[in-house]
């Protein structure tokens, strides 16, 4: 079975949704599936240099191969004419395409090419069909959907959602297409040295609250910061993440902290990867993500995998898994509910530890790439 994964970018700066493709591809290759990834060399949207990678030739990695193509002519939108030309020429070599992201020109055009070449394809929306997300640039998206995404959805072999709630709430533009619900997996590198506290000025004698995600309005920082400012408990807040697509919003959040009472109890560490990311997740007593909408929440699963309990909103679409497994605390998207959840979580260290253990067990059983790969393979086989 030969599968083509198409994704606008796999640069680290785009976070979990892009990195998921690498984890899935590695697990599928390990299970004997021939995997090719077609992507661009995009490495951020504002001023960053593109990835320094070979272009248009296969690059071997973890049992699969990657073709990188130059972003041109619309670099900001991760568009590549060369990728589309390659796909048109090589689509017959594959049994199925798994296309990641909607409302992204290279993905949308790839789906249209796959359809014209009779190559079955699965679409993974990455939360772009959430009604809240569709409100952003609403008129443009309605036009885009009418011209491109509605035919793409109608012609897809299946739509890949990562949670039951995402499947339930997503807009289909009056199309009827098979749903498949397949969660995302986590695979963290070994933890860095124990010097993480010293490096970032994180005290060892206070509860650590960690926010690790893209610094974006949808992540609920406008709720979290006022809650922390008035929480009254003794804690230290770690803000980890960045936003190369909207650096002005990131700067606004940094300034808000700098000029508030949180200044002396906050470490702003920026975008972290590798062993340092793992070390921060392990060092945290609570992982906090009060998003307004989140189709899965890969960072939540990563925190759970190292035994850190989570405090999340009921708009993170795996919240019911967290609630059933008692892996953390659930809040509504308002200041009062989030305050109550954090106070309850901080009040009982014994309960924190127990819910952290529950989280790790649940993640091992449900967010393992090897187990998820078997579900994905069965789905591929059903669709080919």
Feature annotation, model-predicted:
Residues 116, 142-158:
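Membrane-proximal helix-turn-helix segments that form the acceptor-binding/catalytic region
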Residues 162, 166-186:
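Helix-loop-beta element that forms the nucleotide-linked donor phosphate-binding surface
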Residues 292:
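Aromatic "clamp/platform" in nucleotide-sugar-dependent glycosyltransferases that forms part
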Residues 328-336, 344-350:
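Conserved acidic donor-binding segment of nucleotide-sugar-dependent glycosyltransferases
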Residues 4, 160, 202-219, 225-229, ...:
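Conserved donor-binding/catalytic core segment of Leloir-type glycosyltransferases
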Residues 309-313:
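Short hydrophobic beta-strand element within catalytic cores of glycosyltransferases
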Residues 1-53, 58-65, 229:
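N-terminal subdomain of nucleotide-sugar transferases
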Residues 43-44, 186, 212, 236-254, ...:
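Glycosyltransferase donor-sugar binding loop
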């Amino acid at each position: 079975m030969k599968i083509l994964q198409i994704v606008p970018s796999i640069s680290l700066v785009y976070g979990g949704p892009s990195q998921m493709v690498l984890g899935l591809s590695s697990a599928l290759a390990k299970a004997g599936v021939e995997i090719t990834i077609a992507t661009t060399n995009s490495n951020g949207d504002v001023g960053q240099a593109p990835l320094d990678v070979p272009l248009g030739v296969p690059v071997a990695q973890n049992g699969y191969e990657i073709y990188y193509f130059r972003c041109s002519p619309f670099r900001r939108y991760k568009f590549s004419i060369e990728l589309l030309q390659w796909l048109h020429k090589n689509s017959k070599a594959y049994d199925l395409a798994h296309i990641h992201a909607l409302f992204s020109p290279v993905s949308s055009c790839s789906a249209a090419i796959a359809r014209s070449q009779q190559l079955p394809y699965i679409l993974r929306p990455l939360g772009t069909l959430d009604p809240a997300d569709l409100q952003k640039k609403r008129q443009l998206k309605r036009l885009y959907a009418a011209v491109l995404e509605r035919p793409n959805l109608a012609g897809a072999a299946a739509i890949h959602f990562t949670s039951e709630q995402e499947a339930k709430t997503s807009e289909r533009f009056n199309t009827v297409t098979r749903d498949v619900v397949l969660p995302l997996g986590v695979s963290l590198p070994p933890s860095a040295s124990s010097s993480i506290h010293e490096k970032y000025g994180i005290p060892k004698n206070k509860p650590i609250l960690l926010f690790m995600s893209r610094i974006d309005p949808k992540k609920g920082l406008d709720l979290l910061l006022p809650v922390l400012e008035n929480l009254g408990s003794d804690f230290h807040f770690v803000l980890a993440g960045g936003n190369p697509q909207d650096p002005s919003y990131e700067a606004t959040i940094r300034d808000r902290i700098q000029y508030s009472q949180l200044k002396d109890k906050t470490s702003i560490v920026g975008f972290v990867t590798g062993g340092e990311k793992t070390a921060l997740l392990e060092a945290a007593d609570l992982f906090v993500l009060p998003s307004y909408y989140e189709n899965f929440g890969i960072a939540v699963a990563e925190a759970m995998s190292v035994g850190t309990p989570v405090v999340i909103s009921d708009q993170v679409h795996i919240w019911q898994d967290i609630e059933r497994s008692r892996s953390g605390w659930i809040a509504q998207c308002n200041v009062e509910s989030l305050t109550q959840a954090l106070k309850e979580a901080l009040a009982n260290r014994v309960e924190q530890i127990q819910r952290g253990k529950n989280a790790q067990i649940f993640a091992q059983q449900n967010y393992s790439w090897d187990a998820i790969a078997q579900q994905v393979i069965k789905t591929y086989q059903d669709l080919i």
